[in-house]
Amino acid sequence: MIQEQTMLNVADNSGARRVMCIKVLGGSHRRYAHVGDIIKVTIKEAIPRGKVKKGDVLKAVVVRTRKGVRRPDGSVIRFDGNACVLLNNTSEQVIGTRIFGPVTRELRNEKFMKIISLAPEVL
């Protein structure tokens, strides 16, 4: 579960390392975001000469959470940390060209097939 002020790792090569959630999108007073939800983030830590810089405000999609994802068969997939992939603010296209670490099958919809195809492992 991701809420405002949550720090997340960035799972792509856009140049950001750590981001902070500043808003959960979708609904007027939505409190939590789960895997596959879009959030608004600000970049807290970035590498030099990256595509993004510290202080930028972007959209991101949550790809891994410590809370995990519950499947219809009752199984739960949990991860060691919270991670997201940065998106362009207007077109919501992926900024990076590589995805690091596994992602879940819950991202498999029309919007995020690019993330599924770039990911090294889909759980």
From Swiss-Prot:
Gene3D superfamilies: Ribosomal protein L14. Keywords: Ribonucleoprotein, Ribosomal protein, RNA-binding, rRNA-binding. One of its GO terms (molecular function) is structural constituent of ribosome. GO terms for biological process: translation. PROSITE patterns: RIBOSOMAL_L14 (PS00049). Pfam families: Ribosomal_L14. Binds to 23S rRNA. Forms part of two intersubunit bridges in the 70S ribosome. Part of the 50S ribosomal subunit. Forms a cluster with proteins L3 and L19. In the 70S ribosome, L14 and L19 interact and together make contacts with the 16S rRNA in bridges B5 and B8. Belongs to the universal ribosomal protein uL14 family. HAMAP family: Ribosomal_uL14 (MF_01367). This is Large ribosomal subunit protein uL14. It comes from Photorhabdus laumondii subsp. laumondii (strain DSM 15139 / CIP 105565 / TT01) (Photorhabdus luminescens subsp. laumondii). The lineage of its organism: Bacteria, Pseudomonadati, Pseudomonadota, Gammaproteobacteria, Enterobacterales. The gene is rplN.
